[in-house]
Amino acid sequence: MERKRVYTFGNGKAEGKADMRNLLGGKGANLAEMNLIGVPVPPGFTITTDVCSEYYDLGKDKVVELLKADVEKAIANIETLMNSKFGDVANPLLVSVRSGARASMPGMMDTILNLGLNDEVVEGMSRKTNNPRFAWDSYRRFVQMYGDVVLGMKPTNKEDIDPFEAIIEEVKEAKGVKLDNELDVEDLKTLVAKFKAAVKAQTGKDFPTSAYEQLWGAICAVFDSWMNERAILYRKMEGIPAEWGTAVSVQAMVFGNMGETSATGVCFSRDAGNGEDLFNGEYLINAQGEDVVAGIRTPQQITKIGSQRWAERAGISEEDRIAKYPSMEEAMPEIYKQLDELQTKLENHYRDMQDMEFTVQEGKLWFLQTRNGKRTGAAMVKIAIDLLHQGMIDEKTALARIEPNKLDELLHPVFDKTA
């Protein structure tokens, strides 16, 4: 029997499940599992870790040939569920491409968002969303990410300048503005043209315009990143065998930057710092994933209590907080209610503190990923004990959750919270 290389997920169905980490990677297994328990996840598919081994054994061309029919069928499945078409001008489907090994590890390929855009599709997207700035901003981000990650233009050391960042600075300076979001549509068009010229100058090739050419480039870049220097070094340190390989997850894009009813954020089912059983997180209205962690805009708190605590620490009055930095609980109560229900569902399902990423596209909530959250030593102990007392785990599991090397943190002095 022909081995199965591509597993689809979407609309509450999935060919994979949580215990298939070895084959689908951590991310792919979780995306499948979330679908199966009724969490809204944008549809997509995962290419297995076995294919990564085939990639190194048989070579790139052979693997693309082996995958072609399965990937095209999986894309057609996403098109049906999202009611849009890959590479289509009038009603475009865009996708994200992510790497996902069984253990999360640095050095692996960064995520690529907005794949499927070109000069024609961006105009179609502009008309469809009635938001040209959003369409061109998505395109600008895509060319930059693809150039950095797939075409190898990202600087390898801190001293080198990222060619794309240099162009952004140059355009901002010429315009006399400080922030990226102060650039208008015409500026973004200029950026795209300059970005593509930089790609041609550095790689000798034009930026790929075909959606499938872009997709194959990104898929192969994930497999290539498995053998990059940082990844190899990390595996040596952690004792991870090279033959594990990485999976590739391709997923329909959902957009948090389609206006005031869209948002993006990250949240935790408990406090990762002190272990308090308090749902918390940050979000930004009209923004895309990276913006929350990039520090370009001040993210707002998800819960009202979190927002009030944050304002108190930052010396912001309650009037100012409500006017300028309202919590999601206050600004988007319906979405907040759904988010709160789903984070509880996920924590109960995985029986551990969850770190989740989500996007709201025009009033519809989508979960992008969930994983067991990283936590401090103190939080680790408190969460394990609380979960035990709440009947979610037994004593044996609680003990197994205590990492001995983290206990060392508890022996060091810490700042007094009340100080």
How would you name each of these model-derived features?
Residues 1-419:
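Nucleotide/phosphate-binding sheet-loop regions of phosphoryl- and nucleotidyl-transfer enzymes
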